[in-house]
Structures are given as structure tokens and as C-alpha cells.
Design a protein with these regions (language model features):
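Hydrophobic/aromatic-rich transmembrane helices and adjacent perimembrane loops
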Residues: 132-133, 139, 285, 302-350
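Membrane-interface transmembrane helices that cradle and orient dolichyl/undecaprenyl
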Residues: 109-113, 149-169, 176-177
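Signature aromatic-anchored transmembrane alpha helix within multi-pass, membrane-resident enzymes
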Residues: 338-377
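Start-transfer (signal-anchor) and selected internal transmembrane alpha helices
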Residues: 1-32, 197-222
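Transmembrane-lumen/periplasm boundary regions of multi-pass, lipid-linked membrane glycan transferases
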Residues: 38, 42, 49-52, 80, ...
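Aromatic/acidic, Gly/Pro-rich catalytic loop(s) in extracytoplasmic/lumenal soluble domains
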Residues: 433-486
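Extracytoplasmic catalytic/substrate-binding loops of multi-pass membrane glycan-assembly enzymes
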Residues: 34-52, 61-74, 83-86, 384-392
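Transmembrane-helix motifs of polytopic, lipid-linked glycan transferases
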Residues: 90-110, 148, 287-291
Length: 486
């Protein structure tokens, strides 16, 4: 009887397919749970994004807004499914899943399957990636456009099949990214740097490839002209896209923010996000990857990573809140560091299976510690760290739980939180009225949010019939006043 080899076992032959599938399901589940439960609320930045979506209309002035593709996608979800915590965050969740798929194919092109799986496992459980992936803010667009740009550029440079499709896709991605502040700078910098490296330059200007860029260039030019026209109609859009007014020239304060964000080991909150955004193990692997990629900087891959890294770091010095713009290069460097660590160990014992097995055990333990540590830090941090928990408004879900869309009542809220309730009135609760000052007399039932409860005078004629609460500090979220004492 012929002895069965390990390579003949079904699970072994399909191990990478099972690994990729498991990772995909793991990340989709993690990002949806994050959107609904951890942190389970809306930051002020997310509420401000809803405000922009509320004021969209299909006139020239109405669509002259930054991050237009995101707002259009959010508006589509509001039209189809109404306004809820999930529909507000749905565009970010979808773009996050699409970004993770793009990163998977990018890493698969650059690394061995084992390195790809381990790197994606770390990425999928990193607090920063999970946080940005569930946050309905501009952060996810920086990750999305970065992942697609690097993927399509890699497919073109590696002469993948259907090269014309990847060129057109790169042109569309580049054009749409111009709706996001500061991406003009990244795109322009990458184009200039591409001409400095012989390999990308060959694919851009050689006679053999010039004609293949005609259609992509036309698409990029057309969308660019449309954005230019919108900027001509709305000077505010132009200044927002350029981003000069948002830069901070207090270099010392900016460097301190970056120190808190990446290096300082004690937890704090910077821009609604718990820092440091990566643990010490990940930073060590990134440092190793940085060193290894510098040794091979002449290669197209290392040149691309370092180019993006330098451009992003130059921007972060003046705008330290733009951490999402550097997250993809950092994860690629982490993969480089992980691959280097494995190669270094296997290089020490090329023919000793026991030593190689021991190294595999140690590396597996490192990955497990990073995955479990990242998951617990994210979940426990946004559930129990007081400074972080207080940054997120969970009142929308609470109000929907305790009312019906056919109810008629007045809702007294602050101007800061008003956008989510205006969206709710527009798409779900058509019978309610949103007010910002307390009425003199009670007409219909009045709901008063926690933020403006002090506006209700003690001599108010209405009767406080009940209070809607949650299980957090300052849990008195809505005060309900009626005209009688039923």
C-alpha cells in the first residue's frame, strides 16, 4: 500500500483557500460588530459627515462638497433603508471590506501565501484598522484609495492580464481620490517619483505603452475637469481640497501628537481614537521591515513603499490627524518585517526540521499574542476607557428603540447633535419636529436630549412623564414632557 504524503491530504492542499476564507469571514464579522457595538455610537466627526449628506442636492452647488463619493453612498443607504446607526456607518463598512480585499490581493502579489495570511490576521485585529473601518468619516477613504492605487499600480508593473482594465481602474481611482483633501498632493508626488524610477517610467512614457494610456488619461482628465468646474463654482471646495487652511504649523505640538499616537505606551485619546494605535510588537516588525526595504530600495516595491511613506510623513508633520494615510504602508512594512523574521530563522537552520519547527511555534505564539492583544485592547478600550466612551453619542439607537416612526413629538436637541435627528426626520420619522430652544408651552409631547436639559426652566408648564436612560455614566439621555399627568 502506497504511503500517503502530507501534500495529498485535502486540507493541506486547500489550506490557503481555507485560510483566506476564514480571514474574510473574520474581518467582515469583526467590522460589523465594531460598527454596532464597539464603540457602538457616533463621534462628532461622524455627525458632521451626516450633516453634509443632509444638505446634498443635485445642483452644481449641492454636489460641490469634499468626499462626494462617500456622501452619495451614505445618502443612498438613507434612501433605501432609512437612518440608523448601521446605515450611517454602512459606507465605511463597505469601503473597509473592499479595502481589505484590495490589501489581500496586493500582499498576495508581493509576498508568500503564509506571510500574506499572517499579516492580514494581524491587520484584521488591529485597533486602528477596526476603528477606521467602522467610523463614518473621511479616514476610510484614505485607506480605500491608498489600497486601490497601490494594487492597480502593482498589477500594471507586474504585467498582469487585462492590463488595460487596471490602467482605467487606476485612472478612475486617482480621479475620485481628488474629491478627498490632500490626495492631489499624494498623487502628484507619486507621479513625479514614478518618473525618477526606471521601471515605472518605462510603463509610463515608453513608445510601447504610450497608446495604452490614452483612454485612462482621457478619463482622468474628464473627471479632473469636472472637479475643477465644481471648484470654480465653489471656492470653499477648492480651499478644502487643497487643505492649506487645515494645516497646523505648530511643529512641536504636531510632533507631540504623533508621539502620543504611535510611541507613547500609556493609553490616551487622540481624535476620538485610543492611542497608541499599534502595540510594541507591531512597531518592532515595522522597524525591521523598514530596515529590510531600505536595503532593497532600488526595487520597484520598496521604492513605492518609501515614496508613499515619505510623502505621508511630510503631510503628517503639518496635519497629524491624517494617520489613515500612512496605515497601508505601515502594514506592508509589517509584512516585510514578518517575512524577514521568518527567513532569518529558517536561514539559520536550512536543513534542521526540528529547529525550523521550533521557530514556527515561536512565530505562531507571537502572532497569537498580537491578535489576541489587539482584539482585547480594542474591545475593552472602547467599552471601558472613560475618556473614549464619552466621545460617542449612542442616543440615536436609544431613541429609535423607545419610539415608533409614526409617533408625533417635538425633539429638543443641541445644534451639534442635530444632524442625525434631521436625517431621521427626513427619511424615517416624518411626524417629528426638531427644535433648538425650549417652547414656552407644551403642545405635543416634548423629548429633551441630555445635552440641552438645562434649557428647561423649573417653571415649565409641561409634566415630566418619564426619562429614557442607558447603562452608562450620564445615562439620563432623554426627558419626556407631556401636557398632562397621565
Amino acid at each position: 500500500m502506497k504511503k500517503q504524503k502530507v501534500t495529498d491530504i485535502f486540507l493541506y492542499r486547500w489550506r490557503y483557500v481555507f485560510g483566506y476564507t476564514l480571514l474574510t469571514l473574520l474581518y467582515i464579522g469583526a467590522i460589523i460588530i465594531s460598527a454596532l457595538h464597539v464603540p457602538g455610537g457616533l463621534s462628532q466627526a461622524e455627525i458632521d459627515m451626516v450633516n453634509t449628506t443632509n444638505h446634498l442636492n443635485f445642483s452644481v452647488e449641492g454636489i460641490a462638497v469634499t468626499n462626494l463619493p462617500f456622501h452619495l453612498l451614505q445618502l443612498l443607504f438613507f434612501k433605501l433603508f432609512g437612518v440608523s446607526l448601521l446605515t450611517i456607518k454602512a459606507p465605511a463598512v463597505i469601503l473597509s471590506i473592499a479595502s481589505s480585499v484590495a490589501i489581500f490581493f496586493l500582499l498576495k502579489r508581493w509576498f508568500k501565501p503564509s506571510t500574506t495570511i499572517l499579516s492580514l490576521l494581524i491587520m484584521a485585529t488591529t485597533g486602528q484598522f477596526l476603528f477606521i473601518g467602522q467610523s463614518a468619516t473621511v479616514g476610510i477613504l484614505y485607506i480605500f484609495y491608498t489600497a486601490l492605487t497601490l494594487l492597480f499600480a502593482t498589477l500594471i508593473l507586474q504585467k498582469a492580464q487585462n492590463a488595460s482594465i487596471w490602467r482605467i481602474s487606476l485612472a478612475i481611482t486617482t480621479a475620485l481620490s481628488l474629491f478627498t483633501p490632500y490626495f492631489w498632493y499624494i498623487n502628484l508626488g507619486l507621479l513625479i517619483i514614478a518618473f525618477l524610477h526606471p521601471h515605472p517610467r518605462y510603463f509610463l512614457i515608453s513608445r510601447k505603452h504610450r497608446k495604452s494610456w490614452i483612454v485612462p488619461s482621457a478619463i482622468l482628465f474628464a473627471i479632473g475637469c469636472a472637479i475643477g468646474f465644481l471648484c470654480y463654482k465653489s471656492h470653499a471646495l477648492f480651499y478644502n481640497l487643497i487643505g492649506i487652511n487645515s494645516l497646523s504649523f505648530d511643529i512641536i505640538a504636531n510632533l507631540r501628537t504623533l508621539y502620543y499616537t504611535y510611541i507613547r505606551i500609556f493609553p490616551s485619546v487622540v481624535g476620538n481614537q485610543i492611542t497608541p494605535i499599534m502595540d510594541i510588537n507591531a512597531m518592532v516588525l515595522i522597524g525591521l521591515g523598514l530596515f529590510r526595504s531600505f536595503q532593497k530600495i532600488s526595487s520597484a516595491r520598496s521604492f513605492m513603499i518609501w515614496s508613499w511613506l515619505i510623502l505621508a510623513l511630510a503631510l503628517l508633520i503639518f496635519q497629524p490627524s491624517l494617520t489613515p494615510i500612512i496605515i497601508i504602508p505601515l502594514f506592508i512594512l509589517l509584512a516585510v518585517g514578518l517575512e524577514s523574521l521568518m527567513n532569518m530563522w529558517y536561514g539559520l537552520f536550512p536543513r534542521n526540521p526540528y529547529a525550523r519547527g521550533t521557530g514556527l511555534v515561536f512565530i505562531s505564539m507571537l502572532i497569537i499574542v498580537m491578535v489576541m492583544g489587539g482584539s482585547f485592547r480594542y474591545i475593552d478600550g472602547y467599552r471601558y476607557f472613560p475618556e473614549a466612551v464619552s466621545r460617542f453619542n449612542k442616543d440615536l439607537s436609544l431613541l429609535r428603540k423607545n419610539t415608533a416612526s409614526t409617533d408625533s413629538f417635538s425633539l429638543l436637541v443641541s445644534k451639534e447633535e442635530s444632524p442625525i435627528y434631521e436625517a431621521l426626520k427626513k427619511h424615517n420619522y416624518h411626524q417629528i419636529s426638531i427644535i433648538h430652544t425650549a417652547p414656552a408651552n407644551v403642545g405635543q409631547t416634548l423629548y429633551v436630549s441630555h445635552r440641552v436639559k438645562s434649557q428647561i426652566p423649573q417653571t415649565y408648564s409641561g409634566h415630566l412623564s418619564s426619562v429614557i436612560v442607558n447603562d452608562h455614566k450620564d445615562g439620563d439621555r432623554f426627558y419626556i414632557y407631556t401636557s398632562d399627568r397621565k
